[in-house]
Amino acid sequence: MAWRIARSAIAACAVLSGLMPAAAQSVEEFYAGRTVTLIISFGAGGLNDIAGRLVAQHLPRFIPGRPRIIVQNMPGAGGLVAANHLYNAAPQDGSVLVQLDRSVAQSGIRGAANVKFDPLKFTWLGSLSNYDNEAYLLWVNVSHPARTVADINRLATPTRLGAVSGGTNMLMSLTAKETLGLNVKVIRGYVSGPAVWLAMDRAEVDGQTIGFTSVMAEHPEKWENKEIRPLLQFGRATRLSLFSELPTARELAPTPEARALVEFAELPFLTSLPYVAPPNLPPDRTRPLQAAFIKMSRDEAFIADARKRRVELSPSDGDQIMAVLRRSAAMPKKVIEQFNAILEAQN
């Protein structure tokens, strides 16, 4: 009888150990020899892709076990496709990470269509830029007649701005139109940033909204050869010194209500190029990943490589990202509803 009880106990222990392999593994054991997938939520060629591949190259050195990281591009709906995939379909063990568009988390907070995740439950590792040394700009081709942002409203025909559906450039272009009252027409439906650049080259559109770092990483020759002209700054409370002659969107907001909408729209810039792991990741795996991201962002080799690829760095950690998301979620309901109305009116 005692032998049968002992044998049953041994069998039960074997079953339980088979059900809980992760609990018996250290972080180093989990990642050693493993291939981690980093999903980039946009197509190849743009700043998101450039920065994502930079992180995939350097981050393994700082993760215990030094896993290999491969890149997978998963564009769609301004980053929502990748976010929904990570939250609902990807392995939840830390073997899949995602670089999201900065606007995706706020899309979840404001209850945008097709959102199937709670951004506050993602495991935020950090972001590469808080926009301290950056500006998001409204650009036009140099052949366009507008020399200043005020000129846009003096023209008989709207200035056509190309945009990726659901992306930051769509959100900022609509903010310029509906909140600042600029005479622009937002041409959506482009699948990627490179497609918008091509549309500008072909004169299908007159311009777009895009960050200065993106311009310098993707098409520095357009700035250096004066092929494009900046007219307006987004993402900043004050003017970036490089563009001291250009007004900020907040300066042009005609009413306190409009300024509140602009400030809400600009909050995601504080968490640009963010990286996330799945929700409910165990703390013993979360902390090493978050620490690895920050160590990487301070590493001399990483910084030098980022400079070479023209990726502007002003990193934030996961806690700082969560603070921005909570700030966004705490905005007055009326502001969020007004912002949603601006976007929904264009659908």
PLM features per residue range, with description:
Residues 10, 55, 172-173, 289, ...:
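Generic structural signal for hydrophobic residues
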